[in-house]
Amino acid sequence: MIKIKKGLNLPIAGAPVQVIEEGPDIHYVALLGEEYVGMRPSMLVQEGDWVKKGQALFEDKKNPGVMFTAPASGKVSAINRGERRVLQSVVIEIDGDEQVPFEHYEESSLNQLSDEQVQRHLLASGLWTALRTRPFSKTPVPNSRPRAIFISAMDTQPLAADPQVIIATESEAFNHGLTILARLTEGKVHVCHAPGQAVASYQNAQVTYNEFSGPHPAGLVGTHIHFLEPVSLNKTVWHVGYQDVIAIGKLFTRGELWTDRIVSLAGPQVEQPVLLRTRLGASLSELTTGRLKEGDNRIISGSVLSGTAFSATHGYLGRFHQQVSVIREGREKELFGWVMPGRDKYSITRTTLGHFFKHKLFAFSTDMHGGERAMVPIGNYERVMPLDILATHLLRDLLAGDTDSAAALGCLELDEEDLALCTFVCPGKYEYGPVLRDILTKIEQEG
């Protein structure tokens, strides 16, 4: 077992009850284009077209054959684009349940499928896009092979669902998914889980089970990769979400695209935080109707640390998100707030009284408690960075745009979510995730 000592479990109120309930009926779903790093779409449908679930909506121009398929049947009600015609979302108004049938196999023959058969099947169904590379967090290029594949069967994000509760409902499909993923690599398939969780029921020479314990980010796949299979420009691994492993298992045994999603709906502004069964790309406004406290709320697809805020074109459950978080918009001004003791304010340093209440949960809002200022190295970053990385030096080089030094200090191992805690504890209020993405893009372009 690998024990993580550095990190932070955010003391936020509104943790969900780990019981799965049926979510509300969803009438609109969407595929969000900006979730796929570097993707350039070639549209195969137009607004007003009627599509089946599993039908291709667009193809990646940079990687021919990588199809992005509809998560539901119905009418394409909107294709939203942003600046420079960047694809933001393809919205589908759900109508019926017609779907594209896919080939399926006997359970006993799954471990005999070739790499080419598996890739072809995943590409046609759109489930290939559930895979992401490290470094760069991009959809893998067809016909490539990773050194290893990672599945994170644990989640230490604030307000997260317990993956064990979800995997237990589809354990057979999860095991079938592991069999399929093992066909894509000659290396290991690493299943990372918390201590005491019974996910190690499937025996395969390539599948290994690894226990991680400790505070967040002990559950992030970037942490697992760092300790088990560190990556570089010459070494690539893939990772995939545990619910997508279930979907892959069902695709190959049933021949249909499984688009169910069990998500945590939680946060200080949720009336009854719980796990909801919904569908991939579900409308967040429909998902949260009647479940929020009154007030000016911010709905977030994903974690409060690294998720995507609700907007007109992005108001849908993200492809890689397992939770919906809701916090209050912090628009109020506080007179002389800087001299108040701060009993209801949390800080990782001893600057507020709330720091000393070790078991108190806080109703966090979007208030940043100050504006941008100089980056001050007072040890905050090192407290929450468990990786073998010089955090302050790396963050400084990211802000300076020094690609060579940032790469030497380990930025290739990171994704935006790996620096979310550094953003949270930063006295200078810097957003390190977007800066990291810019540096990674430059490194990739420069080769």
From Swiss-Prot:
Name of the molecule in the record: Na(+)-translocating NADH-quinone reductase subunit A
- Per its database record, what is this protein's job? NQR complex catalyzes the reduction of ubiquinone-1 to ubiquinol by two successive reactions, coupled with the transport of Na(+) ions from the cytoplasm to the periplasm. NqrA to NqrE are probably involved in the second step, the conversion of ubisemiquinone to ubiquinol.
What the entry lists under InterPro entries is as follows:
NqrA, NQRA_2nd, NqrA_C_domain, NQRA_N
Key word Membrane present? no
- Subunit structure, interactors included: Composed of six subunits; NqrA, NqrB, NqrC, NqrD, NqrE and NqrF.
Q: Which reaction does it catalyse?
A: a ubiquinone + n Na(+)(in) + NADH + H(+) = a ubiquinol + n Na(+)(out) + NAD(+)
The scientific name of the source species is Yersinia enterocolitica serotype O:8 / biotype 1B (strain NCTC 13174 / 8081)
Sorted alphabetically, which keywords does the UniProt record give?
A: Ion transport, NAD, Sodium, Sodium transport, Translocase, Transport, Ubiquinone
Q: What protein family does this chain belong to?
A: Belongs to the NqrA family.
Q: What EC number(s) would the UniProt record show?
A: 7.2.1.1
Q: Does the keyword NAD apply?
A: yes
